[in-house]
Amino acid sequence: MQSTKEHRAFLIGRFQPFHLGHLEIVKRILRENDSIIIGIGSAQYSHTTVNPFTAGERHLMISRTLEREHVYNYYLVPIEDVNANSLWVSHVEALAPKFDVVYTNNPLVRRLFTEKHYEVRSLPMVNRSEWTGTKIREKMIKGENWEQNVPEPVVEVIREIDGISRIRQLSTTDEDVP
């Protein structure tokens, strides 16, 4: 008899912005699981050079991308940071639907979920030389081609919110103001 239990995965990231590497990882996870919970990490942060986009903006980037890719078996959950690592997994569990497996390469996240007896799987790194949030944000600031590294719906959201102007302004200091 075949099991009817749904296998639901959990993936956490800041998605600043959601890029092609993230999209590829989501698709790979969904080949092994029935659905995925995507935790939008550090949800309380925005308007900094490291976290320029709000949780709501990141939600739009991800949901529009997945809809365009005809992926509908996902949940998006904003997750704020807590200042006590030992409580973080319980915090995630309180916010997210139940899940069976966690996907991460982050050593701290791996440790915290392992201590709570979750199955934790590693993620393959996909085109890491180009597809990192840090490199994409740097390209935005420098006026270089960043669009090729993110899905088209992400480009659209960033343009809608004037995200390039925002991140460029955030990257300046008061000494840069005339």
From Swiss-Prot:
GO biological process: NAD biosynthetic process
Lineage: Archaea, Methanobacteriati, Thermoplasmatota, Thermoplasmata, Thermoplasmatales
Family: Belongs to the archaeal NMN adenylyltransferase family.
EC number: 2.7.7.1
Subcellular compartments: Cytoplasm
Full protein name: Nicotinamide-nucleotide adenylyltransferase
Listed GO MF terms: ATP binding; nicotinamide-nucleotide adenylyltransferase activity
The species this protein was found in: Thermoplasma volcanium (strain ATCC 51530 / DSM 4299 / JCM 9571 / NBRC 15438 / GSS1)
Keywords attached to this entry: ATP-binding, Cytoplasm, NAD, Nucleotide-binding, Nucleotidyltransferase, Pyridine nucleotide biosynthesis, Transferase
Annotated catalysed reactions: beta-nicotinamide D-ribonucleotide + ATP + H(+) = diphosphate + NAD(+)
Pathway(s) annotated for this protein in UniProt: Cofactor biosynthesis; NAD(+) biosynthesis; NAD(+) from nicotinamide D-ribonucleotide: step 1/1
NCBIfam families recorded: arch_NMN_Atrans (TIGR01527), cyt_tran_rel (TIGR00125), PRK01153.1 (NF002243)
